[in-house]
Every structure is written in C-alpha cells, then in structure tokens.
Amino acid sequence: MHRVRRLHKPMIYVIGCGGTGSHVVNQIVDVHSAMVNQGHEGVSVRAFDGDSVAYSNVGRQAFYLQDVGQPKSKVLIERINMHYGLNWSHRGNLMRKEQIRADIIVSCVDTKASRKTIKSADMNDNTYIIECGNARSSGQVILGQHKGDLPNPYDEHPALTKGKEPKGEGCLDPYYKQDLPVNRQVAVYVQQIIWNLLRKHELSHRGVFFDLAQFASNGVQTTERRSA
C-alpha cells in the first residue's frame, strides 16, 4: 500500500499533447469537473508540446480539422478554458534541467530523449510521475515518484531512457499502424490513477500493462521504494 499525501488543487503537467496527451488533457478536465461538483477545488493543468496539429492527427488525436496548423498545447488548453471558464496554461517543449513546480507529471512523450529531459528536471522529491507508453495494440501506465516512497519509473524501467531510439514513427504514425483506441485506453488509465490520487488515502495498485488485441490487462501492485 502507498499512503497518498493530500493534494490541494494540485498542479498537473501534461508533457506531450499528441496521440495520448491530447486525450489525457480531456480526461483530466472531467476529473476537475467531478471534483468541483463535490465541493473540492479541482486541479490546475499546464500542457507542453512544441508541435502543431497536422491533418494526419485528426481522428487519432483529440483535434478537429479547424485545428490544423495550430500549436497542439495551445488549441487544447484554450478550448478547455473557453468551455469551462478555467485559466489553465500551455507552452512549448519542456527544457532540459527545467525547474518543475508540479504535484503530478503525466509523461505522454514517445522518445527516450524526451523522457531523459523529464528525468533531469528539477522537481520535488515527492512529485508523482505517471509514465505512459504504447505500441501497436498494447500499452502501459505506471505511477511513481521522483525520489519519494514509490520507485521512479525511469529507474525502475531503464529502457525508457537508455539505448537507441526505436525505429518507426510512434504515436505520430499517420497510417494507423497502431490500433485506433490504444491512445484513448492509455488516457483512461491515466484518469483512473489521477482520480485515485485525489480521492483515496491509500493505493493498492499503481499502474497497468494491457493489450487490446488480447483483451487482457495486468495491474501493477504498489510496492514502496526499498531503502539503501
């Protein structure tokens, strides 16, 4: 079990607003609305992505034809702010060794270099990191902490940041070599983890590995970081 520290209107960074991140942002605003409706303060979000919307993104990612050519993080956040009366923020890419003031980081990037940038950032030891990834029909969502009680996802799974970049276009694939629902499924699991962090005092599970083609999933039980 992991005892969750109480988070008051947490700041959530969503890093990467493509195939997974664009859906994650929309899932988080649902969490915010549900929390506010129950008398809580909700959450704040800052979205990061340096890319612009392409025609090939429409359909797989949470964008519309009129968004083409616009910065991804900008169009997502401005749409949410307009419809929900919020003041969430957006910007381009996260910089290496950047100072982070987030309670929760959701990593929706698809390169080792981008994950290294997140790992190198200056953040609080207890910052929660939700690491997302997917392949053709499978994916994983893992919750950890920078240097807190839960393992850091990048130390726990070194292959996320070490070695050569895999070949292929990842989530940017315009030819739908990945199953269409896979990014949305990752986003749903992210929503569940954030909901648990905000609504529960203890976590028995902190992630999942799934395969949509096999209709299979395996939860990751919570284990505390071992002392040296």
Give the residues covered by each predicted segment.
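Glycine-rich phosphate/adenylate-binding loop
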Residues: 1-20, 24, 100-101, 112-115, ...
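Alpha-helix termini
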Residues: 3, 30-41, 123-124
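Glycine-rich adenosine-cofactor-binding loop
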Residues: 8-38, 46-54
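Residue-level recognition of the N-termini of beta-strands and the immediately preceding loop/turn
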Residues: 10, 41-45, 88, 127
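N-terminal Rossmann-like NAD(P) cofactor-binding subdomain of oxidoreductases
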Residues: 39-40, 48, 109, 121-122, ...
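Glycine-rich phosphate-binding loop and adjoining beta1-alpha1-beta2 segment
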Residues: 41-84
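A structured beta-alpha segment of the ubiquitous adenosine-cofactor-binding alpha/beta core
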Residues: 68-102, 109-114
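N-terminal Rossmann-like NAD(P) cofactor-binding module of classical short-chain dehydrogenase/reductase
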Residues: 106-107, 130
